[in-house]
Amino acid sequence: VAGEMEQQYEALAEQGKTPLFFVRDGHPMGIIAVADAIKEDSAQAIAELQHMGIDVYMITGDNEKTAQAIAKQAGVTHVIAGVLPDGKEAVIRRLKTEGRVAMVGDGINDAPALTRADLGIAIGAGADVAIDAADVVLMKSRLTDVSAAIRLGRATLRNIHENLFWAFFYNIICIPLAAGFY
């Protein structure tokens, strides 16, 4: 029976499900599996972020097989599995040594990592503590809004840089020219 349950465990985990065993007096009685359904726009959101040149990581407490199966469905290539709730913040700290990091989360366990990231993005339907910890709150639960928010931020920054250029140009060139004519 143990061998059969082990095979069932492996099969369920490879499907992105978390197997749970029922045990009575130390003997396995059965196995069921639970699974989170990925958001229907996950694959599109991941593809958009990757097209923007952003490396996407999935940081999860799920076991490696379950995490890999979910990542495959969503199109994520970098998976860090088996992370305890306190560990997400440490992972973000490590990733920050490689460059700028944005973190998207919706739960209580995500709050420290959202705070640690250069940009914390909370899903609006998430826990209040995650929303309070984030820099940006997505009002809807659409993951495609993450790439839209990043595009908006980049466009805003580009506009600021252009305005600063013209302000300095005016102050350095035009004001002395105007002063010379009086």
Language model features: what each stretch is:
Residues Q8, L12-T18, F22-E162:
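Conserved ATP-binding TGD loop and adjacent catalytic N/P-domain core of P-type ATPases
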Residues F165-Y182:
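Helix-interface capping motifs at the ends of transmembrane segments in multi-pass membrane proteins
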